[in-house]
Amino acid sequence: MNTALTIAGSDCSGGAGIQADLKTFAAHKVYGMSAITALTAQNTLGVTGISESSPEFFKAQLDAIFTDIYPDAVKIGMVASKELIETCLLYTSPSPRDTERS
């Protein structure tokens, strides 16, 4: 089975973000994994709050994924800060950066 990682925010209403990505993966018979960049309070009327994941916790999520079930593909959505973008680059750049992850 193919695997995919979504890096994005979590939408409590299920219409966007991690939740929507995982539904899409499942519909295409892809094993989905997620690394959450932020929790959002939102619905179809709008976003009322955002709580960003700490860079340390975000890195812990990516470490857990990339040391076990390495994804065949990565989909990136909402990334809430420059620090989280820089962490994403350590795991998703075309050049190997394993030594920089520590």
Regions from the language model: what does each represent?
Residues 35, 77, 97:
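A cross-family glycoside hydrolase active-site/sugar-binding cleft signature
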Residues 72-85:
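N-terminal glycine-rich "phosphate-gripper" loop used for MgATP/nucleotide binding
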